[in-house]
């Protein structure tokens, strides 16, 4: 019997506990072909390893069949099959449970107490926007995505550095990247004093112009030998720019903005023990950032001990010999391709139509973000130049298109209601979800709506992971939205949702609309994690 919000993780945990001690044997099915006959499977090979001759004891069958507990989905049947132990859920009951509480499946719950504090540092934002490399753009988009996901889960995030270049600020607005701005630099006097004290009068006469001194970091690297710092790090040349970077980080940690957002300063020296610093850097910046991390620890005994690095892999564009495109050039290329593709589809020059300007801007950003974020951030990314990524089922445009189809569907229902074709939407508690028996409907609920928040929480883990690098899976949301779009598109093309205005058909129509309400909410939450607003038309 299910209690509370249903969860795939909770159900799997209960299933494995029912089998007894040992490694997990159950997994959730995802393929449509398998979901026609089962929802979970314990493979025969795993059962043979667990039980003598693969014979499952009768007590295990009974325990699985009577499975219940917080978050555990209700079981219909459990039976041995050639593939293994097959389990099917009470699908109408699962539909009713999930679709009767949409918000708890589409919106992350805020914790009762304040979450941890995170300083999220993206060095690429100190660059000039006109020279921003594609690998740096990738780091910026990954950082923005992380900020949104962390805040959605109640984590207090302070984004560093505040952007001072107005051209960079304008470019970020085009990309729908939310980042704080500032007009003044922080003071570096205290850090400069620390540097001079560490030099102990041993200032070198041969230092390059603008360098205050050379500080040895070798001892720190050796002390943290297993942490993951590059063993070749020896020393760091300290400049005013380096001190400015450290001063910004120091300010973010000690003078925490209220609510984790830029704004009035919170209480000074808010404590560093509960603070995690995440440096999101391009692969070209990784070595220098390790030096700055160590230098901060050397100069400031109150620097956070928990500093993690996320190194984004290189980005290359195929078909562009010689010099790589800058980030603004890449944006203009994708924007032009979006406008061209839309002109071919709709005819005429819609790019000059003010009503379409914002739509094209959003589609361009969606194209870029899905290209940049659909690959694991640590991996190399190869972008196509001439082959436009706005086409096909794996593009951001495809996701935005299907989100717009949902908007059109509900607008159609609204107009039908106003014209008297359909009755107003009944209470959800009165809907008959046993009328949802199409395999596409279960696919949408079981693969998308039900596991969505669990997937979102797996994007980044702030748990005490050893080592310098933080496990981050920023590709998960993009891949999820693409798969959801494919499943929804297949269902929508095959099933007529708004049927004939006949009373005996309304029950199934309303059950389907409630399911698609859930799909719409999941779409909107997922897109919000990418900084993308849903479109009502394309």
Swiss-Prot record:
Gene3D superfamilies: Isoleucyl-tRNA Synthetase, Domain 1. Disulfide bonds: none annotated. InterPro entries: DALR_anticod-bd, DALRD3, tRNAsynth_Ia_anticodon-bd. One of its GO terms (molecular function) is ATP binding. It holds the Pfam family DALR_1. GO terms for biological process: arginyl-tRNA aminoacylation; tRNA C3-cytosine methylation. It comes from the Eukaryota. Signal peptide: none annotated. Part of a complex containing tRNA(Arg) and METTL2. Interacts with tRNA(Arg)(CCU) and tRNA(Arg)(UCU). Interacts with METTL2. Involved in tRNA methylation. Facilitates the recognition and targeting of tRNA(Arg)(CCU) and tRNA(Arg)(UCU) substrates for N(3)-methylcytidine modification by METTL2. This is DALR anticodon-binding domain-containing protein 3. It comes from Mus musculus (Mouse).
